[in-house]
From Swiss-Prot:
HAMAP family: RecO. InterPro entries: ARFGAP/RecO, DNA_rep/recomb_RecO_N, NA-bd_OB-fold, RecO, RecO_C. One of its GO terms (cellular component) is bacterial nucleoid. It comes from Roseobacter denitrificans (strain ATCC 33942 / OCh 114). This is DNA repair protein RecO. Keywords: DNA damage, DNA recombination, DNA repair. Involved in DNA repair and RecF pathway recombination. Belongs to the RecO family.
Length: 241
């Protein structure tokens, strides 16, 4: 068995004396693990940084074996992240969430495209939080938790939408909320793709996407806690408000 494709490095861990096991995200093969022989060596270890874009060749005797990777660097994203606390926190959040959420060896091409685009924006501090928010919405969509924000779930109206139902992920208008308003999640305009995305609105939107990541996605994955890297990114972002 063999395939070759570019992918994004999600994580690496030592395996034996000199090898490493890496997890990558690729367009056609999804989240995929494999052994890199010599992965802890001075030559290869610097290549295996989270977020790195790699040219990957995977080989195994049988399809269900872990197999091994040959890796070649395409581009590193470490430099953009290391000089910027927000970028580093964001990179860690993206790779941790993908490792947490993605089923093994299942393609999610639209999410891959959005992930590559997002990581290529690392270091662009003014636009990156909004790009990350849109990526979280895409992540929820691809994992089966799409938000439906075009019309009120109660009245059907398409204006004055200011809440999200924590159960259904559907928008709710001020009129439709009634006495339930204090139990609903915020729906800032930026979450509907309206406006330029001021930081205060993005912070509100993170409350809503974070709820669905924690209370729906993570719970359905056996109740495992969401990776702390996501909370650290939101906290780092909130410091600039």
């Amino acid at each position: 068995m063999e395939w070759r494709e570019e992918g994004i490095l999600l994580s690496t861990r030592r395996h034996g004396e000199s090898a490493a096991i890496i997890e990558v995200f690729t367009p056609s093969h999804g989240r995929h693990a494999g052994v890199v022989r010599g992965g802890t060596s001075r030559k290869i270890a610097p290549i295996l940084q989270p977020g790195a874009q790699l040219d990957l060749t995977w080989r195994a005797r049988l399809e269900d074996h872990i197999g091994s990777f040959l890796v070649e660097p395409v581009r590193s994203r470490a430099a953009a992240a290391m000089g910027d606390r927000l970028a580093l926190a964001g990179l860690n959040a993206v790779t941790a969430l993908l490792g947490f959420c993605l089923p093994e060896r299942e393609a999610h091409r639209p999410l891959y495209v959005e992930t590559e685009r997002l990581l290529d924006l690392l270091g662009e501090g003014e636009i990156w939080p909004l790009a990350y928010l849109r990526w979280e919405v895409q992540l929820l969509h691809d994992m089966g938790y799409a938000l439906a924000l075009e019309a009120c779930a109660v009245t059907g109206q398409r204006d004055d939408l200011i809440y999200v139902s924590p159960k259904s992920g559907r928008a709710v208008s001020a009129k439709g909320a009634g006495d339930w308003a204090d139990r609903l999640l915020p729906l800032p305009p930026i979450l509907r793709g309206i406006g330029g995305g001021p930081d205060a609105e993005i912070a509100q939107a993170f409350i809503t996407t974070g709820y669905f990541l924690t209370e729906h996605l993570a719970r359905d994955l056996g109740g495992k806690p969401l990776p702390e890297a996501r909370a650290r990114f939101v906290e780092t972002f909130s410091r600039r408000l």
